[in-house]
Amino acid sequence: MEERLDSLSTKDRQELRNIRTLLWGSNDIGIFERWSQGFEFSDQEPSALVQCQGGPCAVIAPVQAFLLKILLMDTPGYSFYDLTADKCRTAICNILMKCKETKYRIVTLRTSEEVAPQTPPSDVVDAARLNDADPVASPSSPPPVVVGEQQQQTEEGTESSQQPGTWDPDQFHERLTIVDMETIDEVEKFYLENMNLLMGHYGVLLLLYSVLATKGIENVVQELNDTSEPLIHGTYGYGSQGLINLMLTGRAVGHVWDNDEDVGGLKLRGINQQSDIGFITTMEQMRYCTVGSFYRIQRTQFG
C-alpha cells in the first residue's frame, strides 16, 4: 500500500456511485441511519456484537459468525472474553479474503477539509445500468486522506454539523475514498492502525462498501442476475439474501440451495461449494426456500 492515500479517480468515483445505487436504490433516506453504527461488543455478553437498530444484521451477523469460528477453532483454551477487537479485525479480514477478485479495495473516509464538490445526485446511475462505465466529470483532486489519530483530531475540530453521526447520505458518500492493497497483511495493518474506522459511527457501512468494492460491482451484478431490487430493502432496511451470501461465501448469489437450478428456463444461482459458516432459516420451515447441504453441513464443524 502506498503511504499517500490518493484521491478518487473518475473510475473509482463511478464505482462508489454504482455501489450506492445497488445497495439503496433511489432512496436511502431513513434506512441509512439504521445502518449507521460501528462494531462494538455488548457490556452484558462479552461474546456478542451489538446491533443498534433493525437492518445491519446482514453485515454484523456474518462478522459474529466468523468471530465465533476463530474463537472455537483457532483459539486453544478459549474464553468468550477472548473476543476482542483484534479478533474482530481478523474476522473482517476473513470476509474480505473470500470476496477478493484482483486486489483489496478498502473504503474509508476523508475529512471535511478534503471533500471536493460532487456532481448532482441525478448523476447516480440506475441499477439497470450498473455495468455501464460512463465517465463522469471529476472535480479537482483533494489532498490525501488523513487516517488514525490525525483524522480523529481533525474531526474533533470541525463544527457539530460535520461530525460523524450527523451526516445525511449525501454528506457520507461525498467523504468516501478507496485505498487499494495487494495483500491481506496490508489490510490487517491498515485496520490495526485505524481501528477507529470500524468502531466509529460508520464502521458497518465502511466494511460493507469495502466488501462490494473488493468484489467488484460488475462481479456482484453478474452473480445476482437480478438487480431490479436494491440489496437493502427500502422500507424495512434488512439485507437481501444475495448480500448475506456475499458476506458468508464471497459470492453474491440470490439463493441458498446447492449449485444452480433451472426454473422455467431461468438459471437461478445457489451456493457452489461447502461454506465455512453454516446457514439455516425459518423461511425453510414455512417452505419458502430450501437450504442446500453446502450451507447445512458447513466445512468447519463445531463441537
Regions inferred by a protein language model and the residue ranges of each:
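Cysteine-dependent deubiquitinase/ubiquitin-like isopeptidase catalytic cores across multiple families
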Residues: 2-53, 59, 64-66, 70-148, ...
